[in-house]
UniProtKB/Swiss-Prot annotation:
Reactions it catalyzes: 4-hydroxybutanoate + ATP + CoA = 4-hydroxybutanoyl-CoA + AMP + diphosphate; acetate + ATP + CoA = acetyl-CoA + AMP + diphosphate; propanoate + ATP + CoA = propanoyl-CoA + AMP + diphosphate; a medium-chain fatty acid + ATP + CoA = a medium-chain fatty acyl-CoA + AMP + diphosphate
GO molecular function: acetate-CoA ligase activity; ATP binding; medium-chain fatty acid-CoA ligase activity; propionate-CoA ligase activity
Protein name as catalogued: 4-hydroxybutyrate--CoA ligase 2
Family from the record: Belongs to the ATP-dependent AMP-binding enzyme family.
Cofactor: Mg(2+); Mn(2+)
The organism of origin for this protein: Metallosphaera sedula (strain ATCC 51363 / DSM 5348 / JCM 9185 / NBRC 15509 / TH2)
Phylogenetic classification of the source organism: Archaea, Thermoproteota, Thermoprotei, Sulfolobales, Sulfolobaceae
Physiological role: Catalyzes the ligation of coenzyme A (CoA) to 4-hydroxybutyrate (4HB). It can also use butyrate, valerate, propionate, acetate and 3-hydroxybutyrate (3HB) as substrates.
Length: 549
């Protein structure tokens, strides 16, 4: 693959000891052997070691194999952040198959589409989400396995009547005997993640064993994880390849603290009790966590390494995190790159800068993780100059780029071409080589011949005290083509007027970048928390057409 060829040196065994298939299953082999007594998982009031974790994976894998699950078979998993879900990142590939994590916030119709499109043989569903599947049971080809709800045993008993098998019954047929690693080809699939589909049907992103292995190693290196690390699962395991941490934690024998709901008092208690060192989340989670802790005069007793992605952290968020004992690290990536592909590598000399300047630097998507590649290309496929002004498209390649889209050769050819994955993100490259995304190409606003970055305007609006979330987009205008429009979601109890917002922007932005229209209200989101700007644009177009008629 990719031109790899074993050299024909005299006396060298071409099947020798110097080569092994790169797969994250090697991490579990090591952890199960050398970290037997180390705590692997904490979940509610229970905790267990890597010895037990290894045994559970063997039981899950062998139980599936005894049910006829074999090489390249798919298993969908719909669940909160539970230990059984974490174990499936190893158990399913140990059985030779492919794990298909599914967002439990999706509609029943969307769940059915993914289960069927992925050709899943089984679907394990956490009891709270069973009813969603039952609505489309007749459309699903896979066999449903119920993962019982520890919170509600009586409800699970009732739900049991709706399925042929429970997870507990499945694993009763398994064995703790060690299984050999089945992966013989590094580029065979290990997981199949579906994109959130902001504008259409979700696409199945094919991740391979080699990519999962090397992505995890990069996470460990970039975020300085080791045997003493404790990772809090604030990030859903179904989201963007779980950012690689389902494998990275096991690679170093770290402890996984499973959080099955976003509960800010609980997050604080777990960080303190378990001495959490790392966590991942979107900016809104950190904003709400800081708000809770500040209202209750709380601080973390140890520094927590907080990965943030999805949007650059605002200065107010950075300040709030510093005040409660958190350190924010901005990363960037997509499902197609197993989550993070680049990091805003922080330089010590930046610590002395004013917070506003630090925030501007940290807002950048930065440079690629070690051993990955990233660039910004113009329309002719050439790198843009490092001037911080010329806009191009972010392209990526490396070990952690997906194989393509499952059963979708047209979309694969569209995005994976000329040796690069084309992200669709518009960006500039600063003189120091750090990349900064200015927008999605489809979200750039063309007003009076000027191109306006919706992200730039959103960053500015997020500086207004009391603003919870912002979506900036273009609405049709006969004179200007489009005008800059902002939908603002306010924190509870906060009052703000359109005039105040526009005045704030005029003091900080060019006149053509300032919103001409400001609306207040909820922002439509996908099930994975991505803003659906196309919904707002469609509403604006419908309104404009109605006014014309």
């Amino acid at each position: 693959m990719g031109g790899f060829k074993i050299p024909n040196y005299e006396g060298v065994d071409p099947t020798g000891s110097w080569y092994s298939v790169l797969t994250p299953l090697l991490f579990l082999e090591r952890a199960g052997k050398y970290f037997k007594d180390k705590t692997a998982v904490v979940y509610r009031d229970s905790r267990y070691t890597y010895s037990t974790f290894y045994d559970n994976v063997m039981v899950q894998a062998s139980a599936l194999m005894r049910r006829g699950f074999s090489r390249e078979d798919k298993l969908s998993f719909i669940s909160r952040n539970r230990p059984e879900f974490l174990e499936s990142f190893f158990g399913v590939p140990y059985a030779g198959g492919v794990l298909v994590p599914i967002n439990f916030r999706l509609s029943p119709k969307e769940m059915a589409y993914i289960i069927n499109h992925s050709d899943s043989k089984f679907v394990v569903v956490d009891e709270p989400y069973l009813n969603s599947l039952l609505e489309v049971k007749d459309q699903i080809k896979a066999e449903i396995i119920l993962l019982e709800d520890p919170d509600n045993p009586s409800a699970s008993e009732t739900a049991r009547k709706e399925v042929r098998m429970t997870y507990r019954e499945l694993v009763k047929g398994g064995s703790r005997d060690p299984l050999p690693i089945p992966a013989k080809e590094e580029y065979s699939m290990i997981t199949l993640y579906y994109t959130s589909g902001t504008t259409g049907l979700p696409k199945g992103v094919m991740h391979h064993h080699r990519g999962a292995f090397l992505n995890a190693m990069a996470e460990v290196l970039e975020h300085q994880m080791d045997l003493n690390s404790v990772y809090l699962w604030t990030l859903p395991m179904f989201h963007a390849a779980s950012w690689g941490f389902s494998w990275a934690t096991v690679a170093v024998g770290a402890t996984n603290v499973c959080l099955d709901k976003v509960d800010y008092p609980l997050i604080y208690r777990l960080v303190e009790k378990e001495r959490v060192t790392h966590m991942c989340a979107a900016p809104t989670v950190y904003v709400n966590l800081a708000d809770y802790m500040k209202r209750n005069n709380l601080k973390f007793s140890n520094r927590v390494h907080m990965l943030v992605a999805g949007a650059a952290p605002a200065p107010a968020t950075l300040k709030a995190m510093q005040e409660i004992g958190g350190y924010m690290c901005h990363v960037y990536g997509l499902t197609e790159t197993y989550g993070p592909h680049s990091i805003c590598e922080w330089r010590r000399e930046w610590d002395s800068l004013p917070l506003e300047e630090q925030a501007k630097l940290k807002a950048r998507q930065g440079i690629p993780y070690v051993s990955f590649e990233m660039d910004v290309f113009d329309a002719n496929g050439k790198p843009v100059p490092w001037d911080g002004k010329t806009i191009g498209e972010v392209v990526m390649r490396g070990h952690n780029v997906a194989l393509g889209y499952y059963k979708n050769p047209e979309k694969t050819a569209e995005s994976f071409r000329d040796g690069w994955f084309h992200s669709g993100d518009a960006a500039v490259v600063h003189p120091d080589g750090y990349i900064e995304i200015v927008d999605r190409f489809k979200d750039l606003i063309n007003t009076g011949g000027e191109k306006v970055s919706s992200i730039l305007v959103e960053k500015t609006l997020m500086e207004i005290p009391g603003v919870k979330a912002v979506a900036v987009y273009g609405t049709p205008d006969e004179k200007w083509g489009e005008v800059v429009t902002a939908r603002i979601e306010l924190q509870e109890g906060v009052k703000l007027t359109e005039e105040e917002v526009i005045k704030f922007c005029k003091e900080r932005l060019a006149h053509f970048e300032c919103p001409k229209i400001v609306e207040f209200g909820p922002i439509p989101m996908t099930a994975t928390g991505k803003m659906q700007k196309y919904v707002l644009r469609n509403e604006a177009k419908a309104k404009a057409n109605k006014e014309k008629s």
